[in-house]
Amino acid sequence: MPVINNQVVLKHLVSMELLTNEEVLGLISRGSEFKAKNVPIANNSHYFTSNLFFENSTRTHKSFEMAERHMGLQVVEFNTDTSSVNKGETLYDTILTMSALGVDICVVRHPEVDYYQSLIKSPSITASIVNGGDGSGQHPSQCLLDLMTIYEEFGHFEGLKIMIAGDLVHSRVAKSNMQILKRLGAEIYFSGPDEWYSKEFEAYGEYRKIDDIIDQLDVLMLLRVQHERHNGSAGFSKEEYHKNFGLTEERYEKLKDTAIIMHPAPVNRNAEIADSLVEAKKARIVAQMENGVYVRMAILEAILNGRSA
């Protein structure tokens, strides 16, 4: 859906691929306005939202909840441990139920890639779907907060050298970011173990060893090692990973003074990044968490715009 009167209008948010550049820039701009506290909040108390997380989450779940409460929405609690999911209820039937009860927005995280396809195509489900992460597929709200953090720092994307490093093949963060960052004009590089890289990345950027290019980077985006998706197949120890692929203190010193470090968290300290660097001067990991609330407020507003259009 379009941008109308400088307001993004969305029915759902499920994939970065479905957003135009104008919508992306509109959402991160709106997030910045919310952060600056100069945007009046409409009375949204007649709207209901629910967060349905079928995978573990701290940042995404709780920042959506914070955003929902900042936006004045009524939050309907949902706990997978006490729901009919444990009786065999399907995801589709769970969302169908929430929609029938009058929930306007369902924020969903689920291990199945593209789980949302049947939900957004169903004429029986009237709730808007916000994808909080679908397996190793997409993570649009994380991508938008990453973009907001980068834009805050540099004021543009064109020409920035950005390396996405780590567990690439299992990362929905990598896949969401590489698509839109390339579209916005950034130079993308990938790094990490060969076994966690695939040819699908070649269309978006070049594979390089981290030590070959670290002194040229504007942004080093580290990825979490996703142990839960490996089935015990990693062929190296935590210490070996940190030495060969992680951000060590020695590598940190090679970064440009203006470079920034990002990580979607949770962080495996002394694996992806040295413990001493998580809150270092060039790190923006805490800023990413903070920006997550504001960009998710912008997402919710855009969905509400779509529901009232």
Swiss-Prot record:
Function noted in UniProt: Catalyzes the condensation of carbamoyl phosphate and aspartate to form carbamoyl aspartate and inorganic phosphate, the committed step in the de novo pyrimidine nucleotide biosynthesis pathway.
Cellular component GO terms held in the UniProt record: cytosol
Gene Ontology MF terms in the entry: amino acid binding; aspartate carbamoyltransferase activity
InterPro entries, sorted: Asp/Orn_carbamoyltranf_P-bd, Asp/Orn_carbamoylTrfase, Asp/Orn_carbamoylTrfase_sf, Asp_carbamoyltransf, Asp_carbamoyltransf_Asp/Orn-bd
Protein name, per record: Aspartate carbamoyltransferase catalytic subunit
Subunit organization: Heterododecamer (2C3:3R2) of six catalytic PyrB chains organized as two trimers (C3), and six regulatory PyrI chains organized as three dimers (R2).
Originating gene: pyrB
Gene3D superfamilies assigned: Aspartate/ornithine carbamoyltransferase
Residues at which carbamoyl phosphate binds: R59, T60, R109, H139, Q142, A265, P266
Organism expressing this protein natively: Streptococcus uberis (strain ATCC BAA-854 / 0140J)
Enzyme class at the top of the EC tree: transferase
Top-level taxon of origin: Bacteria
GO biological process: one example: amino acid metabolic process
Entry keyword set: Pyrimidine biosynthesis, Transferase
Pathway membership: Pyrimidine metabolism; UMP biosynthesis via de novo pathway; (S)-dihydroorotate from bicarbonate: step 2/3
Catalysed reactions listed for this entry: carbamoyl phosphate + L-aspartate = N-carbamoyl-L-aspartate + phosphate + H(+)
The family this protein is said to belong to: Belongs to the aspartate/ornithine carbamoyltransferase superfamily. ATCase family.
E.C. number(s) listed in UniProt: 2.1.3.2
Residues binding L-aspartate, per UniProt: K87, R172, R224
